[in-house]
Amino acid sequence: VTKLPKYDVPEGYDSWSYLNKLCDDGLAERYGDGDQPAGETGQTLRERLDYELGVIQRMGYVDYFLIVWDFINYAKEHGIPVGPGRGSAAGSIVAYCLKITNIDPIHYNLLFERFLNPERVSMPDIDVDFCFERRQEVIDYVGRKYGNDKVVQIVTFGTLAAKGVIRDVGRVMDLPYAFVDSIAKMVPNELNITLSRALEMNPEFRKLYQEDEQVHHLIDMCKRLEGLPRHTSMHAAGVVICQKSADEFVPLSRGSDGSIVTQFTMTTLEELGLLKMDFLGLRTLTVIHDAVKFIENTTGRHIDVDAID
């Protein structure tokens, strides 16, 4: 069971009717110049919207969409640059009508089922890009709205990788740094490389391992520790929003900078049915925003990046 927080809707609405109102308004704005789109095209759009809304309601994700709509709306109202859409969420006309995404799924013939499949129950996952410098403002807003005790960032565990474990174990064994560093540099610069794979790939490394007893002992110790957690840090984007105080669902810890983070990783939080959101800080958005401001300040001409075809 997903533990979704409730979104506080205006008086006279429930979550379902408010989501429908927002989507109707968005459909008129996106496709009908302020009026509901008419004719055969209008009927096709309405059928697609009603289909998606039906799936969202049956799967119990109405409040999820309202929560995402709300913090994106806050960002846009406060001049915080927001990305046009990332990943499978761009295939949803509901997301497009709510201005969660800015990519027309009908024009580009995108599939809603890549995002939310009625035959496979899984949490929708809307990753949102924000200006790198102002991302924290959006997280702070979510904390104020739902309660800072209910909104916490997510831990991530750094593990002992091939080169790092050689240096760490070498230091514990009190071996000379230059000697240990030279061994670590024999590990090829390859993504997710393991010590066993490095020994296969580098004949010089393998020869040293086979002939030097000290190196053999060092690498054997490293193999036993390789892949184990080394340290904790804060996930670059993940934030969990709870129905009740977060400590009722997960253990928490305080980071070195004083921030509160979960002790469970993102995967475990999803298994518990908690709402995990990705607030991604994207430097590209900051650069584009600064460039648009610079052009306006120097030429007086305002460029709407979203209107560039």
Task: Locate the predicted segments by residue.
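Alpha-helical scaffold/interaction cores of sigma-54-like transcription cofactors
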Residues: V1-D309
